[in-house]
Amino acid sequence: MNKWLALLFCSFSAIAAPKDTLSERLAMSEGFSATFNQQVLSPEGKVILTGNGKVDIARPSLFRWETETPDENLLVSDGTTLWHFDPFVEQVTLYRAEEALEQTPFVLLTRNKASDWDAYHVEEKGDVFTLTPTALDSNQGRFQITISEKGVVQGFKVIEQDGQQSEFTFSKVKQQKPNASVFNYKVPKGVEVDDQRN
C-alpha cells in the first residue's frame, strides 16, 4: 500500500513539475530588458518575415515592446492601460491592459500569476517549456518559452493552429527591473486617438 501511494505521489509530482519549474524560473527576476530578433515561418517552414526591436518587462504587468523593423510600432502597458502606437497611420489605440492580455500567453511573462497557469498544460524539455491551452474551444495555438535555470528569458515562440510560427530570440539581456519611467507613455501631438477602454 505504501509503495502504491509513493508511486501515485511521484506521478502527480512529475505532472506538476514543469509548470512549477517554469513559474519558479520566471519568479527569479522582477524584470529585464533586451533586444529581439523575430522570424515568422510558414507552416512549411519558409521564412516569410523577419524583424527586430527592443523589449522591457517589469512584473507585475508592465512592459514596453518596440518593433523597429520591418514596420515600426510600439506597445506600452503601465498595468492599467495598454497603448498601441502605429506611426504609419499616426494612431494610438488604448485598451484595458488586463482585458487585452488576459487571453494571450504573453501575460505569463509579464505577470506570472498563479491562476494564469490553470489555462495551460506545460511540458518541459531542457530550458524549453511548451504551453498548450487546456480549453477545448481555445483558438490559441501553442506557446514556447526558453528560460535558463537562472531565470534568464532567452526567447519565446508562438505556434498557431495552422502551423505558422512566430519566433522571438532575445539578446543583450539585462537582468534587472527597468525604471518605472520606461512604462509611462505620452500620446504624441497630432496623432489620432482611438480609446477602446469603454
Curated annotation (Swiss-Prot):
Keywords, alphabetical: Chaperone, Periplasm, Protein transport, Signal, Transport
GO biological process, one term: lipoprotein localization to outer membrane
Recorded GO CC terms: outer membrane-bounded periplasmic space
Signal peptide: 1-16
UniProt-listed InterPro entries: LolA/LolB/LppX, OM_lipoprot_carrier_LolA-like, OM_lipoprot_carrier_LolA_Pbac
Broad class of the protein's primary localization: periplasm
Function: Participates in the translocation of lipoproteins from the inner membrane to the outer membrane. Only forms a complex with a lipoprotein if the residue after the N-terminal Cys is not an aspartate (The Asp acts as a targeting signal to indicate that the lipoprotein should stay in the inner membrane).
Similarity section: Belongs to the LolA family.
Complex and partners: Monomer.
Cited PANTHER family: OUTER-MEMBRANE LIPOPROTEIN CARRIER PROTEIN
The protein's name: Outer-membrane lipoprotein carrier protein
Natural source organism: Vibrio cholerae serotype O1 (strain ATCC 39541 / Classical Ogawa 395 / O395)
